[in-house]
Regions:
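PLP-dependent enzyme catalytic core of the Aspartate aminotransferase-like
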Residues: 145-154, 160-194
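Conserved core segment of the aminotransferase class I/II
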Residues: 23-102, 110, 190
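Conserved glycine-rich beta-strand-loop-beta hairpin in the small C-terminal domain of fold type I
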Residues: 83, 99-109, 120-133, 164
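Catalytic PLP-binding core of fold-type I/II PLP enzymes
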Residues: 1-15
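Hydrophobic residues in well-ordered beta-strands that form the structural core
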Residues: 1-2, 154-156
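Helix N-cap motif at beta-to-alpha junctions
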Residues: 54, 136-137, 175-177
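Short hydrophobic/aromatic beta-strand micro-patches
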Residues: 51, 131-133, 171-173
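Short, conserved active-site loop motifs that form the nucleotide-linked donor/cofactor pocket
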Residues: 30, 119, 152
Length: 194
């Protein structure tokens, strides 16, 4: 199962390759799950797109999914919105959003690399999330510290596996002013700790 919900937000020079396009072997054994929700900010309109190339795998999916009534989990507004953005008429809007997010990403990465040397930032090629290793900060629980001391809410890396307790995930899909304010508060809280 390949979750490709962030696949629409890809920065220049990079390319998203859906799992079903990787190889014949991948097509034969993969389920691609995606949505327009992240790229087009349609989180309030529930929907999902499930692509299964292999007929026997698709049949197994239908049998497994049938009792859950997934086909009726959406609504007419969701269907209309998804149909509209998939026709290409919102591509220019998505390009503008992607450009804005890239500038936010660059600003956040630059700030953290320059001002918070104990954080190691993985620079994303797409999406609007930073994955940050905080092991250089000497904090027992980085996400808790940032919430309590900096008043900045981040995702605790431990939610993604026990090995990631020293990591945080930061959403940078917000106004540049709010992002700058959050980054400054992180730096200030860490400066006061030192």
């Amino acid at each position: 199962i390949s979750d490709e919900v962030h696949g629409l937000i890809i920065y220049p020079g990079k390319k998203h390759i859906p799992i079903l396009c990787v190889s014949a072997a991948a097509r034969a054994q993969s389920v691609q799950v995606t949505s327009m929700s992240k790229g087009f900010n349609l989180m309030a309109l529930p929907h999902a797109i499930i692509a299964i190339a292999d007929p026997s795998l698709r049949e197994a999916w239908h049998k497994a999914a049938d009792p859950f009534d997934f086909y009726y989990a959406s609504n007419p507004f969701s269907v209309a919105a998804v149909t509209k953005v998939m026709d290409g008429s919102a591509d220019q809007w998505l390009a503008g959003v992607t450009d804005y997010l890239q500038k936010n990403r660059n600003m956040a990465v630059s700030f953290l690399q320059r001002e918070v040397p104990g954080m190691t930032v993985t620079v994303p090629e797409g999406s609007f999330l930073l994955w940050i290793d905080c092991s250089g900060l000497n904090l027992a629980h980085p996400a808790e510290f940032l919430l309590e001391k900096a008043r900045v809410s981040v995702n605790d890396g431990a939610a993604f596996g026990n090995a990631y307790g020293q990591f945080i995930r930061v959403n940078f899909a917000l106004t540049r002013q709010k992002l700058q304010e959050a980054l400054e508060r992180i730096r200030q809280a860490l400066d006061e700790k030192a």
